[in-house]
Curated annotation (Swiss-Prot):
Residues 528-561, 706-735, 996-1046, 1337-1372 are annotated as: Disordered. The lineage of its organism: Eukaryota, Fungi, Dikarya, Basidiomycota, Ustilaginomycotina. Keywords: Cytoplasm. The keyword Cytoplasm applies. The keyword Oxidoreductase does not apply. It is found in: Cytoplasm. Residues 528-540 have a biased composition (Acidic residues). One of its GO terms (molecular function) is mRNA binding. This is Clustered mitochondria protein homolog. Belongs to the CLU family. It comes from Mycosarcoma maydis. Residues 706-723 have a biased composition (Basic and acidic residues). It comes from the Eukaryota. Residues 1021-1046, 1358-1372 have a biased composition (Low complexity).
Amino acid sequence: MDPVTQAPAPEGVDAPEIDESLQPFEINLYLPKRPLIPSAAASANGLPETPSPLKVAVTPQETLNDLRVTITDSPEGYWLGAFCFRKPLASPNSTAKGGKVQLGERVPEWTELREIFEGVDKDKRELHVTHVPFNEADARAHVQRLRDLLSGGAADPSAIGVDAALSVQDAVRNPQEWQQDAARQNANGRAVTKKGVNDAAEASSELPLPLVDWAGWPSVTSIDLIPQVARRPRQLPVCVRQLSLASWNPPPQHCKLNGHLLYLQVGTLEGEVIFVTASTHGFYVNRSSGARFDPSPRPDGQDFASCSLFDLLCGFSPLFLSSFSKLFNDPLSSRDYFSAVPVTNALPAFPWLARNHTHHADALRSQAAFLLTGATSADALEGTRDWNDELQSARELPRTTLSERLMRDRVLNRIYSEFTQAAARAIPKVAAGEVQAMNPMDKRDAQMFIVNNLFISKGADGVDLYPHMGGDEAAHVAVGKDVQGVKTLNSLDVGGLCLLGTIVVDWKGERWVAQSVVPGLFRRRDDADELPEADGETTELAEAAPEKKSPEAKLAQSNKADLNDDTQVVYGGVEGPEVIRDNAAFHKLFHQVAQTLHLNEHQVEDAKGIKHSLWLSVDSKGLRGADGRRYVLDLARLNPVDINWLENDIDGAIHGSSSSPNQDAHYPHRMTLLRPELLEIYWDSEFRKWARAKLAARQEAKAAKDAKAKEAASKEDGEKTEAPEVEAEEPERLDSSEFKLTFNPDAFVEFKVADTLAEEHSKVITPITDESDASIAAVRQASDFLRKVAIPRFVTDVAAGLFTAADGGALSRQMHARGINVRYLGYVARLCSPEAKQELDQELIQKAGPGHEGFLNAFRLTVLQEMVLRASKRVLRGLIRDVEQVNVAACVSHFLNCLVGDKVNAHPKARPSVTPLSDVADAAWTKLTPETLREELKAEIRKRFRFELPASFFEQELRRAQLLREVALRTGIQLQLQEYVLEGKLADADGVVSDGCHGESQTNGNTTNKKNSKGKKKGGNEQQNGVKKSNVGAAAAKPTKAARATSFEPEDVLNLVPMVKDSTPKSTLAEEAFEAGRISISRGDRELGLELLLEGVSFHEQVYGLVHPEVARCYALFATIVHHLAGVAAMERAESINQAKSENKEITEADLPVVNEHLSMANAVRYQRQAVTVSERTLGLDHPETLNQYMNLAVLERSAGNTRESLLCQRRVLELWSLLHGQHHPDCINALSNVALTLQNARLFEASLRVYRSAHELALTLFGADSIHTANLAHELSQAYTLAGDLKTALAVEKEAWRVFEERLGKDDAQTKESEAFCSSLAASAVRVAKLEKEASERQARLPASRRGNSNAGGGAAAITGAGTTASGNGTANKSLDEIVRFIQGGSNGSVAKAKGKSKASRK
C-alpha cells in the first residue's frame, strides 16, 4: 500500500499528494571526448576524467534547457561550448561501425524530461551530448564562461558592493587549513618550502581546544567580524597573463563567410602572446600577431583546434593546465561547496567592514558589454527587457498541478530577483544625473525616468499630493507602504489582478521608486476604455455599460478639460475622492482582496455628491492597461489609519520631558497607518472572544433545557428522556461566517479637495468619521488594542524572558511581526521603566519573579539605541543628500566622528575635497560638531518617538561600537576592515587589512617550533580573541602616513550600497510541502513526514536556488528535525537492545527498528553547516539569524562528537554577541553555558568550571541572586564544582539554588526536590571526605617522623579531588561524568546522578 494513503493530508496542503510520475530519477549522459587532454595528464594535473556515462539526478518537470544549465555549471561539463542533446536510435541495428552508437535527431531544448523518457525504463534513460556549430552568441558566452571561471572569487569593481556574499564559516571551523594555505605563499606570492608547510601542519595538529584557557569573556573588536585567517583575500592561481578580445575584431566580411566569429588575444604564463580564432567549428590558434593579421590556423598541428577554448589553452600551455587544475580543485570549494555557488535569486549581503582589494588590470572587463550583447553600434543594441510583460506572463502561467505550480514559482522568483538587481544598478545612475528625465522642465523631485524599461521616480512629494499630510515626509512613508501593499497582494495571488514590479531603493540620502512600466500608461483614455470587457464574466459587467455611456458622460468625454478625466484609471479615486470611477470587474477582484484583509465595503462620496461603493481605500486605483490586463496601483493605504496617534501624539506629550512640546516637536507627518499584522492579531482575538461567548451561551441554554427536562421528568414519576444526553455528546460546532469584523480603510482619513473660497484654493476634509458604523468603530478599537493590549503584552513577554532582541534590526522585525509600528519605540521604552510596571500583565510578571528587571533593562538599552540609530539615519540622510560625489566619503567619515568618535576627538574637523568646481564653504555637513549632532538626535527622537533621552545616555549608556555597526548596515556604508578606536587614544599607525597590508602576521605563533610553543600558543589565542597584533614587516613596507587625529578618515569609507526593499512574494508551494511533512511527523507517520520534508527542501532549492535566505531557514529547520528524529531513533534502538538483554534474547540487526538513511547526526550537521554558509552570504556575517545558525551548529557538532568544531563555532557565537550587543545580554548566559557544557563533555572540568563561573557571575549581574535564572545557573555551577572535586563550594552554591527554587517554585516542585537531593548527597560526601581526611591525619601522626612527609600523597581528600579534577587517577579515566559524580558521592544516591543527567540533556 502506498504510504501516502495511510495518513490524511493536512487541510489546505497539497504537498502530500505525491505523484510517482513526478519523483526524481537518474539519467545517463554521455559527454564528448577531450583529445587535447590525455588521460595521463588529466590525472597528473588533477583535472577530472570525463565520466562515461555521467549520472545526473533530474526531476520530470525539468526541461532540457534546465539540464543544459546544470551541465555547464558542473565540474564535468564546464568546458563544453555549443552542444545539443540527442537520443540513441531505438532500432535493433543502432550500433554503427567501431561500436559507436547511432544517434537520432536533436531533442528540442524546451521539452520536459518526462515527455522525452515517456515509456522508457528507468535504467535505459540516456542522452548523448554532441558538439554543434557555434554562432557568435555561443562563442561570446563561451569566452565569458572562461573569464568567470578564471577570475574565481576576484573582486568585481562593477558590483554594487565590496566582498559581496562573503562567507567565513570555513575559516571559523578550519582555521588551521587557512593558516596552511597562507603558509604556502609569502608576502610576495612566492611558494615557501615544503618544510615550512609541514611545520605549520604539525603545529596546527597540536593546537589545544579553543576556549580551554578561559579567563573571562574574550576581547573582541570590530575587526573580528572577519576571522583573522580570512582577512587577507585568498590568492587564487593565475592561469593566463592576459585574456581579451583582439583588436582585429570584428572579422572582415570575407572572413565571416569562412565562419569566423571572434578573434581573441591570450598572454600565456610561458610569456607567449597568441591570437585565437573563434569560428563556427570551434577555436584554433591562428598566425596573427599584434602587427599582422592572418587568421588562418597555424601549421603542423600547432593550431590546437578544439570545440572548447578551455581544452585549447590546456593543450597549448602546460602552465595553464597546471594552474587551472589547482583552481579547479580549490580545497575551499570541496570543504564548503555553498560558499562558491553563485548567488542568483537574491541580493547578496555586503559586510559593513570590507577588505580593500588590490585592483588588477583586466582588458576583458571593459569588453564585457560586447560579450553580453554583441553590439558594436547603437542600432545593434538589443531591445531592453519588458519587465512588466515578463512578470505578468509568469503570473498567468498555469498552476493547476504540482509541477505547474513549481515551474510558476521558479519563474516568478527568478524574474523578481533580476528585476530587483536591475533596479538596484539603475537608480545610482539616475541619481548621478546620467539619465535624461522624461519631464526635464519640472522640478527635480517631480522628474520621472525610464531606464531599461524601469519607471523610476523619487519618493518625495514632487507633485504636491501630500502637503496636508506632511509633504516629503509623508511621501517617504507612502512609497514604503506601497511596496508592502504590493507584496501583500503578491502573496494573496488573486487571479486576474495584475501588480507592477515595485521596489524602493534608498541611495545617498534619497528614496527612489522603481516600477515596471504599465502598457499605455501615458496614452489618452478613449471611450473604448469605458466599455466593459466582452469576456462574459458576469451580467454585472453588461449592466455597467449603459451607465458609462450616458449623455452626460459623453458630453464630459467630448469636453475634457480636467487632467483627472484623461487617465487610464477606471476604478477608484483618480486623485483623492473628488473624481471616483466605478468598474464592476475591478470591484469583484477587490472584493477577494478585502475578504482576506478584513476590509469593509463602504460608500465614498465624490465632488458631485455621488456615492461610490469601494472595497479598498479610495486612493487604490484600478487601471486598464493597453494590453487588456487589469492593474492595481497606489496601495499605500491598504490598511486603516492609527487614529489614536493622530489624535493624541501628533503634538502630544513627550515622555521624560518636564516641559511641554513646542512646534519643533510636531510629528513630521500624518501618514500613520496600522500594520496588517495588528489587524490580523486583533481580528483573531475578537474571534476567540466571540467563539467563547457563543459556546458559553450554548452551554447556558443547554443547561436550562436540561433543567426543564429534568423537572418535567420528575413530574412524570421519574421517567427520563435520553434526548438531552444524546445532544450533550454531540461536538460543539460554530459557523465562523457568522462572525463579522471588518475595517473601513478610509475611516478618519484626511483628504485635500478643491475649494475656490479657501486661501490656497483647497481644503482638508475628513468625510468618514461616523463611529455608529461598526467598520469605522473597529478602526478605533484596533488602534486602542495596539496601545492597551499589543504593546504591553510585547513588553511583558520580554520581562518573562520569552523574547530578547539581539540588535535593533531584530527588535524592529519582532515589533512588526506583533503589529507594532516603530513609531511606538518611545512608548515601549516607557513601559520598560519601573514606573510603568503596573501597566504590564501582572500575572506573568508575578510568575517571572525577581530578575525580570534584567531582561527589561537590557531590552530598554536596545530600544534607546534603536531610537538613536533611526534618528542618526535621518540626520545623515539630510546631510548627504546634496553632497557632491567627491565629498561623500568625507561627509560620512565626519558624521561618524561626531556620532561615535567624539571620545577620541571632541572637536573633529571636516576634510572636504576642494576643487575648482566644488563649493563646500557653506555645506551643512562641514559645520557639524558632536554637540550639535547630539542636539539634532535628541530633537529627532522627541519629534518621532515622543520620548526624551536620559541626560546621561550619550556618556554612559551609548554602545558606540554597536551603534557604528548598525548605522553602517542600515545606511549601506562599507568601511575598510580595520580596528576603529572609539574610546581612548589613537595608535600611531593604522591597522588596515588589505591585499598589501594584512594587519596580522601571515603565519602566527602556531606554526613555530615546539620550544616556544607555550608562549606562542598564548599569543595565538589572544590574537583570535580580538587583541590587535602589529605586523612590523607590513608596517615597514607601507609608505609613511601622518598619525590619525580622528577615529575615521575619508579613506576609510569604501563604498555606499543601495538599500533595497522589494515586493518579491514567498513560494507557498515550498512552504506547504515542508509544513505537510512536519504535520505528518507530529501525527506519528515518520517515514511519510521525512519524505515530504525532503520534497519541501527540494522545492525550496528549485524555487529560490541554493543560496537564498529562505533556503537557509529551510536547511536549519530540517537539520533540527533530523537531529531530533535521529535521537528518537537511537533511543528506540537502545531500548530494543536493552529489552532483549533483559530477556536474555539474542538480537540481530533485522530485529532492530529500521532507521531511515537520512536520519543521522552527520546529515543534520551537514544541513546546518549549509544553513550557516547561506545565511552568511545572503543575510550577513553578523546578522542575528546567522548568530542563531551558529548556535544551532555548535549544538549539533557537539551531539555528533565534534568537540573542536563545536567550540570553534561557540567562539564565533561569543564574537558575534560582542559585535551585536556586547556581553551583558541575557542570551549570553546561554552561550556561556553551552561552552561550559561542551568542555565538560570533553572532560575538561577545570575549564568548564571557569566558564560556568563566568555565566553565573553574569546571571548575578543581570538578574540578581533571587532570580530563578540565577538559580538554574547555580545548579549547573554546583555540578561543575562537584566534577572538579570542590565539594565544599559545590554544597554552598547548591544550597543557594535550593533556596531560590523553594521560594519561587515551592517544596513540591521537581526541580526543588532534585536540588534538595543533590544537597543531601553533597553533604554526605563532604562528611565522608572529612572522615577520610581525619583518618589520614591520624595515620600520619602514628607514623615515624622520617616517613610522614612521603605518606600524605595518596589519601583523603586529595585522592578524591584529584579524581574529580583530572579524571585520570584511581581508575576514573574511562568513567562517564555520572560515574565520576557517583564516585565522589561514595556510590550512594544514584538517582541524583540520573537526575543530573536529565538536567544536562535538557540544557542541550
